């Protein structure tokens, strides 16, 4: 064994061994308990960042630990390879998205291997390959036949100059990111999957997810947004149709003083024919990108349509306004407004001088003061005719019943959740497998024409999708009739909604899933990824699992038993102000800092002499130039050091502050272990441990070893507090470093301790542990070694510490055998000089003894 720890030498050797032995490849084995450990698959952006490293290290630690418990562990990896960034990069680098993507995959695969992650590479998949997306296309056609897929027009961001659809992130301050033209909202036909058909199940089954974070479940509950209310129909004077609204507060209905409709509503369109102001307003709304998140903060605007609706219960005429806070794609495109009891309606009514009618009393029973704001709390009705005096629940039911009896109301359960729009007007995605025949019939692409392959050898102009620009690509024949293929591609959330299931049978050619393999491995035992995926990916992931279950492919209701959301990785951020007042962000690697006595940064500059402003720790990002390249750190310290720091610096679900001093500390710890094993093995062979012949000190050290095994096992396995597990190992290492090594049993005990330490550290730092296990002559490869088991007998304390008090004041602490009687403890206490002097010449009037803990002698 060499004296110095050289990670650059041992890590490449160990990785080569894993590759050659195919150590982490697994197959179904009914004789073994399975464990499926999965980290969210990466987008092949070009380089790994520290967020990836943290996510995948957590997953690898769990997978390696479960493997050492004797389970059949599946830990696969793949690439979420479609998506918009590849199109931008292709244009910028004058290439096509496919070669850019495949080059990135090759580079990042090497980076993952360099970090020593124990993946089953035989199951690697890339979602941009026809071998993968063909099954998604087939499944989509089956969902269409089941009535779960439909096409309707929906609003998109449209650049009139480039004649193309823009993703939300390509709209900057209302303009096209590329040509700065003002963006319009345009209605175009798009494909949808009926996720709303599963809304109740998606909501109710959240209760089955005992090991998912409550925050994620709450976010999904709110996103699904189940509400119970009443749908109410209004007649409108001089208008051919009625208006329908939905409300969750029918108790406030007597306070409805106006209706508001979306700018795109047929009523608003009709009114605009003779109203130039309204026509201009509709035009303005059409050119505004309105995401739901922005609705709450934007200025509320509207124009009176001139139409009057009739309140079904009072018979009063109330105005109908077109308003920018109502969207056609939500509900009916019309809402009832109760300005006395809804703050948004109140602000709008105040702005335009509309009637505000209070109908709910304040909590103290007085009429509400509406001079500053609406009263939004529930309460008792007044000003409501026959419903006066009713509380919220009674009024809800009475008004709902009356409207229903009149034929103008219907109780409804509504959802905030909308059907999933899966059409994207982009190139780099899986083609949607639908065709339109010459006679206008729309139908799924026949099975014998699947997959519909995306051409990869294309020229990108940065404006139009190559498959939209090439009229020949869309041409096909179905049943002998000319037809045109759909040129939209799938939302990339489609691919990431079922990849976890395909990992169970990536080579299967008979269908989407091999049910036997899928049902052996599924559900996933632990799924690891960022909380930013709480409502989009993780909802579609659950939805797809239920679709596959209903298609007979899987037999479980949910895709993952446990979800672990790792915290973000933070780093110091610095900038200097440029000549034009702009902020120039400087990498923390290039910052020369001065610190105070507490280690806080008080001054910083860069190599060019710029005075730097320190903004504190923030999420590693390109925009703040504070990302730390994992590859540089691995080359400097080794993969094991980086992995150990990642797991030790913070609990897995909390933010992690990147500190290179902490990385250096992790590296020093690994060097200490290496040195201890080197010194131990240099002394030659070790005798067998005789546990019956140990001294008290040896027993105490062995007790510490086995208590550490018990704690680390609990911390990793049950609590998943990996940082405290490492801290416990470090504490034990400090004791081992001071332990005597001269005697035969000292060395035998050290051998047992080091074999345990190396196995406990193996999930965290597998390369050094692989090597040290060999040097310690552990049996076989450590990858197949069992997890150490704490010896219950070794942990039993044979002595205990008893506090001795005289008249309630502590006078001594004594060590006694655990089975000592009260008499023996009193006798031992009396031998202590500090106790004896207080007992001299006095009478012990009372003895209070708490066995094994406390002896209090009351004297007088």
UniProtKB/Swiss-Prot annotation:
Short motif ('HIGH' region): ranges: 42-52
Keywords (A to Z) from UniProt: Aminoacyl-tRNA synthetase, ATP-binding, Cytoplasm, Ligase, Nucleotide-binding, Protein biosynthesis
Entry binding sites for ATP: 622
Coiled-coil segments on the chain, per record: none
Reactions catalysed according to its record: tRNA(Leu) + L-leucine + ATP = L-leucyl-tRNA(Leu) + AMP + diphosphate
GO molecular function, one term: aminoacyl-tRNA deacylase activity
Motif window: 'KMSKS' region: 619-623
A GO term from the CC aspect: cytosol
Keyword Cytoplasm: yes
Highest taxon, organism lineage: Bacteria
Biological process per Gene Ontology, one example term: leucyl-tRNA aminoacylation
EC number(s) given by UniProt: 6.1.1.4
SUPFAM superfamilies reported in the protein's UniProt record: Anticodon-binding domain of a subclass of class I aminoacyl-tRNA synthetases, Nucleotidylyl transferase, ValRS/IleRS/LeuRS editing domain
Main location: cytoplasm
Subcellular location per the Swiss-Prot or TrEMBL entry: Cytoplasm
Family assignment from sequence similarity: Belongs to the class-I aminoacyl-tRNA synthetase family.
NCBIfam families: leuS_bact (TIGR00396)
PANTHER family, sorted: LEUCINE--TRNA LIGASE, MITOCHONDRIAL, LEUCYL-TRNA SYNTHETASE
Name of this protein: Leucine--tRNA ligase
Species assigned in the record: Escherichia coli (strain ATCC 8739 / DSM 1576 / NBRC 3972 / NCIMB 8545 / WDCM 00012 / Crooks)
Lineage, top ranks: Bacteria, Pseudomonadati, Pseudomonadota, Gammaproteobacteria, Enterobacterales
């Amino acid at each position: 064994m060499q004296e110095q720890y050289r990670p650059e030498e041992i890590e490449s050797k160990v990785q080569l061994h894993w590759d050659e032995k195919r150590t982490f490849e697994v197959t179904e084995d009914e004789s073994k308990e399975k464990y499926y450990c999965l980290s969210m698959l990466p987008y092949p952006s070009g380089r790994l960042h520290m967020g990836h490293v943290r996510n995948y290290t957590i997953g690898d630690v769990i997978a390696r630990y479960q493997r050492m418990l004797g389970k059949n562990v599946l830990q696969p990896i793949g690439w979420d390879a479609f998506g918009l960034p590849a199109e931008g990069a292709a244009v910028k680098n004058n290439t096509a998205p496919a070669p850019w993507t495949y080059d990135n995959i090759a580079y990042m695969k090497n980076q993952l291997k360099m970090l020593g992650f124990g993946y089953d590479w035989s199951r690697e998949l890339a979602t941009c390959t026809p071998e993968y997306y063909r099954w998604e296309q087939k499944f989509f056609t089956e969902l269409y036949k089941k009535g779960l897929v439909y096409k309707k027009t929906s609003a998109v961001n449209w650049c009139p100059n480039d004649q193309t659809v823009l993703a939300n992130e390509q709209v900057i301050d209302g303009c096209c990111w590329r040509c700065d033209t003002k963006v319009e909202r345009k209605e175009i036909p798009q494909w949808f999957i009926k996720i709303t058909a599963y809304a109740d199940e998606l909501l109710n089954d959240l209760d089955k997810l005992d090991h998912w974070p409550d925050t994620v479940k709450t976010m999904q509950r709110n996103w699904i947004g189940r509400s119970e209310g009443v749908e109410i129909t209004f007649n409108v004077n001089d208008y051919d149709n009625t208006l329908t609204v939905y409300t969750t507060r029918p108790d406030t209905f007597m306070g409805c003083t106006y209706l508001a409709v979306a700018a795109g509503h047929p009523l608003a369109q009709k009114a605009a024919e003779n109203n130039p102001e309204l026509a201009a307003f509709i035009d303005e709304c059409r050119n505004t990108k309105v995401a739901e998140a922005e609705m709450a903060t934007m200025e509320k605007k509207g124009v009176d349509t001139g139409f009057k609706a009739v309140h079904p219960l009072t018979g009063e005429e109330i105005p109908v306004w077109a308003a920018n806070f109502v969207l056609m794609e939500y509900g009916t495109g019309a809402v009832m407004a109760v300005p006395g009891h809804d703050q948004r309606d109140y602000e709008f009514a105040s702005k335009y001088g509309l009637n505000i009618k209070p109908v709910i009393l304040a909590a103290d029973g007085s009429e509400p003061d509406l001079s500053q704001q609406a009263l939004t709390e529930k309460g008792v009705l007044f000003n409501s005719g026959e419903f006066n005096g009713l509380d919220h629940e009674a009024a809800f039911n009475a008004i709902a019943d009356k409207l229903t009896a009149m034929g103008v109301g219907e109780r409804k359960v509504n959802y905030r959740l909308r059907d999933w729009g899966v059409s994207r007007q982009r190139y780099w995605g899986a083609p949607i497998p639908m065709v339109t025949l010459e006679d206008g019939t729309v139908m799924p692409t026949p099975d014998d024409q699947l997959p519909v392959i995306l051409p990869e050898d294309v020229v990108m102009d940065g404006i139009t999708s190559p498959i939209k620009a090439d009229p020949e690509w869309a041409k096909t024949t179905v049943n002998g009739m000319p037809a045109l293929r759909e040129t939209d591609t799938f939302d990339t959330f489609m691919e990431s909604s079922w990849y976890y299931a395909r990992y169970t049978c990536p080579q299967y050619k008979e269908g989407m899933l091999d049910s036997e393999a899928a049902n052996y491995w599924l559900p996933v035992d632990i799924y690891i990824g960022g909380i930013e995926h709480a409502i989009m990916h993780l909802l579609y992931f659950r939805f797809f699992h239920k679709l596959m279950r209903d298609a007979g492919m899987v037999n479980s209701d949910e895709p993952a038993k446990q979800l672990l959301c790792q915290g973000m990785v933070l780093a110091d951020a610095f900038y200097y102000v440029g000549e034009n007042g702009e902020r120039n962000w400087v990498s923390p690697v290039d910052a020369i800092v001065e610190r105070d006595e507490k280690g806080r940064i008080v001054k910083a500059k860069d190599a060019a002499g710029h005075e730097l402003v320190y903004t504190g720790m923030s999420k590693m990002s390109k925009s703040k130039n504070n990302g730390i390249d994992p590859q540089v750190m691995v080359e400097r310290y080794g993969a094991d050091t980086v992995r150990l720091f990642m797991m030790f610096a913070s609990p897995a679900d909390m933010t992690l502050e990147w500190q290179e001093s902490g990385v250096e500390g992790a590296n020093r710890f690994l060097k200490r272990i290496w040195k201890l094993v080197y010194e131990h093995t240099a002394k030659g062979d070790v005798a067998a441990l005789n546990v019956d012949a140990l001294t008290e000190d040896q027993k105490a050290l062995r007790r510490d070893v086995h208590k550490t095994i018990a704690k680390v096992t609990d911390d990793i396995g049950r609590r998943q507090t990996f940082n405290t597990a490492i801290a416990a190992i470090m504490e034990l290492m400090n004791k081992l470093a001071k332990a005597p090594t001269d005697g035969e049993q000292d060395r035998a005990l050290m051998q047992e301790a080091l074999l345990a330490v190396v196995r406990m550290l193996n999930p965290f730092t597998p390369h050094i542990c692989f090597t040290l296990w060999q040097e310690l002559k552990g049996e076989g490869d450590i990858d197949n070694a069992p997890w150490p088991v704490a010896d219950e007998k070794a942990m039993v304390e044979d002595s205990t510490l008893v506090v001795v008090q005289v008249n309630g004041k502590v006078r001594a602490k004594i060590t006694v055998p655990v089975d000592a009687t009260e008499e023996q403890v009193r006798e031992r206490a009396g031998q202590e000089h500090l106790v004896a002097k207080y007992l001299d010449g006095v009478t012990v009037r009372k003895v209070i003894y708490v066995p094994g803990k406390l002896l209090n002698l009351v004297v007088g």
